[in-house]
């Protein structure tokens, strides 16, 4: 049974509109991730947004609980129900139906669609909710209805705001399977399992605790798909269900060990975490050092470490993405589009962590052996985090298995010190002034002012309001004062969608910039003469707008070219459009090759040469997406959107553009670079800026020719390269003749010495020179000690040698049997380290 589909179809038959799952990154600054089905509707429940039409909706919402207040990470894998990623089925009424219908719908779905046995079902209500208690008796015996207090059966969004009693449906898994002291209705055992929570939002709680009945009470319900699937399939753990076992079986194949529930926590951790990682990456969250990206990194690294426990010591998580897409790609089609991109990002991150995990685990185990109390050193935990990439909760996870904890206070202190150093030069951004500005009163008085600049670069407009530099309302801006002007209608485009704000003249005053604040289009001016509320001013947008719109249209063509050349996984991660340049950030796991860049550039220029008129359509959002228009993932759009078609490009966009592609003239890529893990950047120019750049290039080429006295630059460059190569060979030969102290021990060449050059290159050189050789070199640069060891065709293991000697100079490190490196702090101990290396080698040989 496809429970997800059955649920949505059932509520659709009851008049509910099916809403697509909102992004995992919510439009809510108070939340790290979308962690419940009601999150996308929060502003409707609070009354900040008008109730929709129809006012009853249903959804299957993807959720993440792995950070912040709602964090299930530590429990995942060790319990039957906890997950970092899950799907929440829900039906919602915004002032339409209430308890009677909510209870009736729930009972009908559970008993007639899911066909769960009625004799296995129990219900709870709030102890004071007589209405719900009476309503339930129409469907279930009174002795199966339990009344509990606020702790169990009252829900609130916060200390203030909408709240109300709730009613929960429970499923009895049987006393033959669960018989602990807590296995009773209301206990903490697993016998009676909550499957559905119906929240009756009927009060508004004020700061003093007073609860006032809402004029239009609402319904918010939630049922976990993973939990109800397990029940329907008669499984006692979510992980035994068809949602997880295919993934667990894949893990078993990778580690070549059979899965057993009692000892299988690592399998469950991996099967859960790969779902979170896949969805977050597919939705545009990337691995990072902070914020959501760091939570993503923590989840993956925790899974990699559990793979390590299973004996998997190479990248493997990326191999599980195919199975996630197979299981969930039909409902979440973007998983199919982003599959290869997600796999590449995961593999790169796995390789990055696996490169340090051995050294990190060695440090962890060394400190563990020294730990005499039940508390692990916070300093070492911080070093594991800072040097080896071990998130604190990963270290805590490993300690929990040993019955220990970590000194989090010391870890936090060191982390705060590091953050303080990083932010020492930060001076603020003025956002506080914007937050406290008089925008709300302007919105209440005038509403949002109209932009009329798609077709007009000039207008005669009325000054509705003026704000000073602190965003406070004033009646007048005097000569020399900087402030903001709100016009009744404005031809100035406010910075949005990556396009910079317009400049120009506003009467006799220069418009320095235009931005949108809380829906208000405001132009920043430096007053030349007095400007007052009620003035009628002649507005004229700078001709820079013509170049801006050319670069904006070129940006759309660039995205179409990227998707054509690199693949459908390309998604915008940021952009900047100005009069003389454009910048476009996009999701891609590796650098774009020269050949690919050439294809991208050619694609754009061919579209420009062909020419095509801009086509603008106003469509409802669903039809726009169905038509193939590209939308920013996670962006909130109005019900009606502006769809722009420019030749091969079709996007949702409210910016200004050319009327025909041939207005762009030409397009030239200036550079390609990396921004962060999985995000690349292309900077480019078009139109006049491209012409100016071509002139600069021509001048540079002519200057090179002049310096070469007319010779062919390419031939001259080849000649210079040949000379450089010859000199490098001479230098290499010279370095070979400068013998280090080479000894012979039982037929093995042994080199133990100080060395100030490139240690790795010298070790490679000596390994190439001798058939059997052991090398140990030590050098100092910028006060830091560098150690390196190499071994070829001997019994000496370079990694073991380095690991033994490094502590002498106050360092640590390791590596392979044939090559290893380490760092240290105490250069005064180099001679002692060299003696120790000589002794180690002599004893082994």
Curated annotation (Swiss-Prot):
What is one GO biological process annotated to this record? negative regulation of DNA-templated transcription
> Molecular function terms in GO for this entry?
alanine-tRNA ligase activity; aminoacyl-tRNA deacylase activity; ATP binding; tRNA binding; zinc ion binding
One Pfam family assigned to this protein is DHHA1
Identify the enzyme class.
ligase
Read off the SMART domains from this record. Answer: tRNA_SAD (SM00863)
Task: Cite the binding residues for Zn(2+).
Answer: 552, 556, 653, 657
What does the note accompanying the cofactor annotation read? Binds 1 zinc ion per subunit.
Q: Where in the cell is it found?
A: Cytoplasm
Q: Which cofactor does it need?
A: Zn(2+)
Going by the UniProt record, its keywords in alphabetical order are: Aminoacyl-tRNA synthetase, ATP-binding, Cytoplasm, Ligase, Metal-binding, Nucleotide-binding, Protein biosynthesis, RNA-binding, tRNA-binding, Zinc
Its recorded reaction(s) are: tRNA(Ala) + L-alanine + ATP = L-alanyl-tRNA(Ala) + AMP + diphosphate
E.C. code? 6.1.1.7
HAMAP family associated with the record: Ala_tRNA_synth_B
Briefly, what is this protein's role? Catalyzes the attachment of alanine to tRNA(Ala) in a two-step reaction: alanine is first activated by ATP to form Ala-AMP and then transferred to the acceptor end of tRNA(Ala). Also edits incorrectly charged Ser-tRNA(Ala) and Gly-tRNA(Ala) via its editing domain.
Family, as annotated: Belongs to the class-II aminoacyl-tRNA synthetase family.
The domain-related comment in the record is: Consists of three domains; the N-terminal catalytic domain, the editing domain and the C-terminal C-Ala domain. The editing domain removes incorrectly charged amino acids, while the C-Ala domain, along with tRNA(Ala), serves as a bridge to cooperatively bring together the editing and aminoacylation centers thus stimulating deacylation of misacylated tRNAs.
Give the protein name, as stated in the record. Alanine--tRNA ligase
Instruction: Read off the lineage from the record.
Output: Bacteria, Pseudomonadati, Campylobacterota, Epsilonproteobacteria, Campylobacterales
């Amino acid at each position: 049974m496809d429970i997800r589909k059955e649920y949505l179809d059932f509520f659709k038959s009851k008049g509910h509109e099916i809403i697509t799952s909102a992004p995992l990154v919510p439009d809510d600054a108070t939340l790290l991730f979308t962690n419940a089905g009601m999150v996308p509707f929060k502003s409707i429940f609070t009354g900040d947004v008008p109730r929709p039409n129809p006012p009853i909706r249903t959804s299957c919402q993807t959720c993440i609980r792995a950070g912040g207040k709602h964090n299930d990470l530590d429990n995942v894998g060790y319990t039957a129900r906890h997950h970092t990623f899950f799907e929440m089925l829900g039906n919602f009424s915004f002032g339409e139906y209430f308890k009677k219908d909510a209870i009736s719908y729930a009972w009908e779905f559970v008993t007639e669609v899911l066909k769960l046995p009625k004799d296995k079902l129990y219900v709870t209500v709030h102890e004071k909710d007589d209405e719900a208690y009476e309503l339930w008796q129409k469907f279930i015996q009174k002795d199966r209805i339990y009344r509990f207090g606020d702790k169990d059966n009252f829900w609130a969004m916060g200390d203030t705001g909408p709240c109300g009693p709730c009613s929960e449906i429970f499923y009895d898994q049987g006393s033959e399977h669960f018989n602990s002291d807590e296995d009773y209705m209301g206990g903490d055992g697993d016998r009676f399992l909550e499957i559905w929570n119906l929240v009756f939002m009927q009060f508004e709680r004020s700061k003093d605790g007073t609860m006032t009945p809402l004029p239009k009470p609402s319904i918010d319900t939630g049922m976990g798909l993973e939990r109800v699937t397990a029940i329907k399939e008669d499984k006692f753990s979510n992980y035994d269900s068809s949602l997880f076992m295919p993934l667990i079986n894949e893990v078993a194949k990778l580690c070549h060990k059979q899965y057993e529930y009692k000892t299988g926590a690592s399998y469950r951790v991996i099967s859960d975490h790969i779902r979170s990682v896949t969805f977050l990456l597919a939705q545009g969250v990337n691995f990072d050092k902070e914020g959501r990206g760091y939570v993503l990194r923590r989840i993956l690294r925790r899974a990699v470490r559990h793979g390590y426990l299973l004996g998997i010591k190479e990248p493997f998580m990326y191999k599980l993405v195919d199975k996630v897409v197979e299981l969930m790609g039909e409902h979440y089609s973007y998983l199919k589009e982003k599959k290869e991109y997600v796999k590449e990002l995961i593999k790169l991150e796995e390789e990055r962590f696996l490169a340090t995990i051995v050294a990190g685990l060695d440090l962890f185990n060394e400190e563990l052996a020294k730990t005499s109390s039940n508390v692990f050193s916070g300093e070492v935990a911080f070093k594991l985090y800072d040097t080896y990439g071990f998130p604190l909760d990963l270290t805590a996870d490993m300690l929990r298995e040993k019955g220990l904890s970590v000194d989090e206070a010391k870890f936090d202190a060191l982390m705060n010190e590091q953050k303080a150093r990083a932010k020492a030069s930060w001076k603020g951004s003025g956002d506080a002034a914007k937050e406290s500005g008089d925008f709300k009163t302007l919105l209440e008085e005038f509403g949002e002012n109209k932009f009329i600049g798609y077709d007009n670069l000039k207008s005669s407009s009325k000054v509705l309001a003026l704000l000073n530099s602190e965003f406070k309302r004033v009646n007048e801006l005097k000569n020399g004062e900087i402030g903001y002007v709100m016009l009744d209608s404005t031809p100035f485009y406010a910075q949005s969608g990556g396009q910079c704000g317009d400049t120009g003249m506003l009467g006799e005053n220069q418009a320095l910039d235009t931005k949108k604040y809380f829906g208000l289009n405001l132009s920043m001016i430096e007053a030349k003469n007095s400007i007052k509320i009620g003035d009628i001013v002649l507005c004229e947008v700078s001709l820079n707008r013509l170049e801006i719109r050319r670069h904006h249209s070129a940006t759309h063509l660039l995205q179409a070219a990227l998707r054509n050349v690199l693949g459908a996984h390309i998604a915008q991660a940021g952009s900047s459009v100005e009069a003389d340049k454009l910048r476009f950030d996009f999701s891609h796991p590796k650098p774009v090759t020269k050949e690919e860049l050439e294809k991208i550039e050619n694609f754009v220029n061919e579209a420009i040469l062909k020419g095509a008129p801009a086509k603008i359509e106003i469509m409802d959002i669903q039809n726009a997406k169905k038509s193939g228009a590209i939308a920013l993932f996670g962006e909130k759009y109005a019900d009606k959107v502006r769809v722009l078609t420019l030749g091969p490009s079709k996007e949702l966009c409210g910016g200004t553009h050319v009327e025909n592609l041939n207005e762009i003239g030409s397009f030239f890529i200036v550079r390609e670079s990396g921004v962060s893990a999985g995000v690349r950047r292309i900077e480019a120019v078009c139109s006049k800026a491209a012409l100016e750049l071509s002139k600069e290039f021509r001048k540079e080429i002519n200057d090179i020719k002049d310096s070469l006295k007319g010779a062919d630059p390419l031939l001259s460059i080849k000649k210079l390269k040949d000379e450089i190569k010859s000199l490098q060979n001479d230098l290499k030969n010279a370095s070979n003749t400068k013998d280090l102290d080479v000894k012979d021990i039982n037929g093995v060449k042994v080199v133990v010495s100080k060395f100030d050059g490139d240690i790795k290159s010298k070790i490679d050189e000596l390994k190439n020179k001798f058939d059997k050789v052991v090398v140990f070199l030590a050098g100092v640069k910028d006060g830091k000690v560098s150690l390196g060891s190499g071994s070829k065709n001997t019994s000496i293991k370079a990694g073991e040698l380095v690991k033994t000697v490094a502590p002498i100079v106050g360092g640590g490190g390791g590596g392979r049997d044939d090559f290893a490196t380490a760092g240290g702090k105490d250069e005064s101990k180099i001679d002692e380290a060299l003696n120790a290396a000589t002794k180690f080698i002599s004893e082994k040989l």
